[in-house]
Amino acid sequence: SDREAEVIRIPTSAILQEEENMYVLVELGNNDYRKQKIETGHTEDGKTVVLSGLNVGDEIVVTGAFYLLDAR
């Protein structure tokens, strides 16, 4: 179905958790980032389904996300 084709999967390591909320860091360019709240689905083989909060084509920080967050 069309719905299935639009599933966004991201590396689980890209997800930051604060209390009950899940976030990723979206790259805006020029070393600028935005913390984006997401809703996640199930995880498989190191990838997690994102149900809402991200669009196809968004660039997210995968490695060192914690460090990036702390440094800002």
Give the role of each language-model region.
Residues 10, 19, 33-35:
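Short edge beta-strand segments in beta-sheet-rich domains
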